[in-house]
């Protein structure tokens, strides 16, 4: 008999802000769920980055191409891309259909299905299982086959909410970019040990930086 699952409720597309930056902020404190025949893996989203319209670092900046079409789907669809031939990155489309923008899921706090995650990342401490975008996709078993998946459908791989209410959100500049480094488009849960990146980037949250479920 399986352990009782957390009562995570799928997020509907209409609940998602129709703005890339606000969506990246909104997703802090929400949940990423991966359902498998052998059980469920889930985690609380503690870090995201926004790649809005017109951002030269976005994969959508050059316009629609065969490889980036999922960024041009209506908000709430997965865009999965292999980076530097090493790690898959899980992004989500963030605007109206045909616009082209996205957010990157950078880290989660693992909650359900820890043995399943640990099997994919053996010998790794809990804190580091999904702390960073490449680690996240490895722990959850996310690859190219998930590109274009509707994350609002509540099956296979999906986004959800557990607690309704306000969540405090910190904001800093993004990580690992060679241009547009000054923009405050990285969002995180203050105090979380599962946030990636240099500790010096974890600045005091800006006044009023709260998101509501």
Curated annotation (Swiss-Prot):
Presence of keyword Disulfide bond: no
This protein's UniProt keywords: DNA damage, DNA repair, Hydrolase
EC number assigned by the record: 3.2.2.-
CDD domains in alphabetical order: AAG (cd00540)
A Gene Ontology molecular function term of the record: DNA binding
Superkingdom in the source lineage: Bacteria
Signal peptide (residue range): none
GO terms under biological process: base-excision repair
A Pfam family annotated for this UniProt entry: Pur_DNA_glyco
InterPro entries named among the record's database cross-references: Formyl_transferase-like_C_sf, MPG, MPG_sf
EC class (word): hydrolase
Record bears the keyword Secreted: no
Entry's family note: Belongs to the DNA glycosylase MPG family.
Cross-referenced HAMAP family: 3MGH
PANTHER family referenced in this protein's UniProt entry, alphabetically: DNA-3-METHYLADENINE GLYCOSYLASE
Protein name: Putative 3-methyladenine DNA glycosylase
Organism for this UniProt entry: Paraburkholderia xenovorans (strain LB400)
């Amino acid at each position: 008999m399986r352990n009782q699952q957390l009562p995570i409720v799928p997020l509907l597309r209409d609940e998602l802000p129709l703005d890339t930056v606000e969506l990246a902020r909104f997703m802090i404190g929400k949940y990423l769920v991966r359902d498998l025949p052998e059980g469920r893996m889930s985690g609380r989203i503690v870090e995201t980055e926004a790649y809005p319209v017109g951002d030269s670092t976005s994969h959508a900046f050059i316009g629609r191409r065969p490889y980036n079409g999922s960024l041009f789907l209506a908000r709430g669809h997965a865009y999965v891309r292999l980076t530097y031939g090493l790690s898959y990155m899980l992004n989500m489309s963030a605007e109206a259909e045909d616009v082209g923008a996205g957010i990157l899921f950078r880290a989660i706090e693992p909650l359900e299905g820890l043995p399943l995650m640990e099997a994919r990342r053996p010998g790794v401490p809990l804190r580091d299982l999904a702390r960073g975008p490449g680690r996240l996709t490895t722990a959850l078993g996310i690859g190219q086959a998930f590109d274009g998946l509707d994350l609002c459908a509540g099956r296979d791989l999906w986004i959800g909410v557990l607690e309704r209410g306000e969540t405090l959100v910190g904001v800093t500049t993004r990580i690992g970019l060679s241009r547009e480094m000054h923009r405050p488009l990285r969002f995180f849960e203050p105090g979380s040990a599962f946030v990636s990146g240099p500790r010096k980037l974890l600045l005091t949250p800006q006044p009023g930086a709260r998101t509501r479920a």
